[in-house]
């Protein structure tokens, strides 16, 4: 269940209320429930996945990819698999937990685990949004934000891309006012 925390400490737990709060940024958030698929659920429960297992999971979400392709111009997707033992986890945490923008939209479908996005409103105030399994977010291009994992250090999510260059962070170096 998504949880949004404002700078003043107020929290929202209703996805509709959260979507309303993020509308000023054109950030889209919604539930995207998974179809019942025991084989995929079993794979999602594993920490480490080989290439074939990752492809099986992506194949199970092909219809979602086709939907994002039509709606958002996504060209390809990959599976982000992060856990405490991941080689790339600390590099990712260092790279993404600072305020930045991207030249493309950032589209992420959480399959397992949880993560936090933070956003900077036009007036400079900041909010944080924790996302969990079966939630989807689309952060428009050039939206100032940051991203980090919760203390569980566990996330499996499908990332959708429109270009290869679009996800390169452009750091804004804004000081974070809110971060748990």
Features from the language model and the residues they span:
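Conserved short histidine dyad/triad with adjacent acidic residue
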Residues: 76-103
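Double-stranded beta-helix
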Residues: 150-180
């Amino acid at each position: 269940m998504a949880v949004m925390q404002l700078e003043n400490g107020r929290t929202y737990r209703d996805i509709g209320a959260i979507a309303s709060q993020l509308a000023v940024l054109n950030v889209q958030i919604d539930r995207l429930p998974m179809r019942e698929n025991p084989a995929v659920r079993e794979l999602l429960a594993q920490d480490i996945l080989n290439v074939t297992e990752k492809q099986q999971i992506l194949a199970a979400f092909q219809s979602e990819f086709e939907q994002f392709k039509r709606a958002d111009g996504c060209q390809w997707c990959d599976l982000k698999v992060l856990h405490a033992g991941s080689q790339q986890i600390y590099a990712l945490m260092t790279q993404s937990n600072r305020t930045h923008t991207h030249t493309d939209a950032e589209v992420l479908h959480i399959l397992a685990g949880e993560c936090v996005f933070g956003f900077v409103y036009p007036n400079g105030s900041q909010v944080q949004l924790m996302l969990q399994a079966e939630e989807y977010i689309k952060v428009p291009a050039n939206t100032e934000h940051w991203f980090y994992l919760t203390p569980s250090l566990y996330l499996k999510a499908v990332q959708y891309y429109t270009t290869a260059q679009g996800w390169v962070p452009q750091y804004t170096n804004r000081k974070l006012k809110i971060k748990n």
